[in-house]
Amino acid sequence: MSGNTFGHLFTVTSFGESHGPAIGCVVDGCPPGLAICEADIQRELDRRKPGTSRHVTQRREPDTVEILSGVFEGKTTGTPIALLIRNQDQRSKDYGNIADTFRPGHADYTYWHKYGIRDPRGGGRSSARETAVRVAAGAIAKKWLSERFGIVVRGHLTQIGDIDIPFTSWDLVDTNPFFAADTSRLDELEAYMDSIRKSCDSIGARLRVVAENVPVGWGEPVFDRLDADIAYAMMGINAVKGVEIGAGFGCVTQRGSEHGDELTPEGFVSNHAGGILGGISTGQHIEVSMAIKPTSSIARPRRSIDRQGQPVNMETHGRHDPCVGIRATPIAEAMLALVLIDHALRHRAQCGDVRVETPQIAGRVG
């Protein structure tokens, strides 16, 4: 299976399946000398791990990370960093009834036609379980970006179903199970998710992730544009079906006089571009939004076919997130950080000595 490596200079190669002994990744290209320990990575993993509330899968995985290589006396050595997370709460018997059928909305049908073999236990390689190692790798990227450039990458949920979640403060995001930046609608969200779960159904979500203090100049024009790589990274997250940069699809109703971000000596007047112009960072906040589809695994009878192409009615049992978007925020943060560190290293390699007389203006006026 190809397509398991992400990045150019800072690369992440992941491995493992949902119900295998372990999942893990190898991070290559990390600059030497970065102080990193398992606790730094564990903090990010704990934000994503399952079983943290009744609104997510009840699979109980501690997601304890082990650093196997690439770190000596608490610092990265510049050699490959191997990270391992052991699976401890698999319940493969829940998937015995789907070995010869294809779950609607899942990768079962496509994996079977592509490879001629598939692991039905928890979705195997296509499971969102794999994203834990992306969060682990992203923790390393986040720490380097923060220490080297003061970059902060953070996200929050903006919508579940038809419930919009306004933004009030970043300080609120990690105080509730929904990664919400406003707590005024928590009771409504709790009741809504309870009703979704009791009806044996699932629901979609929307989230936003922001990178602050990104310098101007990162990104490669044409094919490796910064926004193109960000969209590529986000679309590689399970269940993501749409990505917007800045105003995104909202630009359809904007006029050029409104959408174009004017520049003044004091700074940009707006940020409809989402911090990227011509595929290169502007120095403003990079703002990304994404739409996440409803969980495909639901305990409702649905039509499908078996391997022989015969019609079947099937229900998907097991432990599943009624809204996969709830736990997607740390994953999206990690993927944005991985894109940024890769472009930081690429920029340093080609254009690190470039200096111009024009000062970098503020990200936004007011």
From Swiss-Prot:
Binding-site positions, FMN: 125-127, 238-239, 278, 293-297, 319
Pfam families, A to Z: Chorismate_synt (PF01264)
Record carries keyword Repeat: no
GO BP, one annotated term: amino acid biosynthetic process
Cited SUPFAM superfamilies: Chorismate synthase, AroC (SSF103263)
Annotated positions binding NADP(+): 48, 54
Reactions catalysed: 5-O-(1-carboxyvinyl)-3-phosphoshikimate = chorismate + phosphate
Single GO MF annotation: FMN binding
PROSITE patterns from the UniProt entry: CHORISMATE_SYNTHASE_1 (PS00787), CHORISMATE_SYNTHASE_2 (PS00788), CHORISMATE_SYNTHASE_3 (PS00789)
Entry note: cofactor: Reduced FMN (FMNH(2)).
Keywords in alphabetical order: Amino-acid biosynthesis, Aromatic amino acid biosynthesis, FAD, Flavoprotein, FMN, Lyase, NADP
EC number: 4.2.3.5
GO-annotated cellular components: cytosol
InterPro entries reported for this sequence: Chorismate_synth (IPR000453), Chorismate_synth_AroC_sf (IPR035904), Chorismate_synthase_CS (IPR020541)
Domain of life (superkingdom): Bacteria
Pathway assignment: Metabolic intermediate biosynthesis; chorismate biosynthesis; chorismate from D-erythrose 4-phosphate and phosphoenolpyruvate: step 7/7
Cofactor: FMNH2
Function of the molecule: This reaction introduces a second double bond into the aromatic ring system.
HAMAP family: Chorismate_synth
Subunit structure: Homotetramer.
Family matches, as NCBIfam families: aroC, PRK05382.1
Protein family per UniProt: Belongs to the chorismate synthase family.
The protein's name: Chorismate synthase
Source organism of this protein record: Laribacter hongkongensis (strain HLHK9)
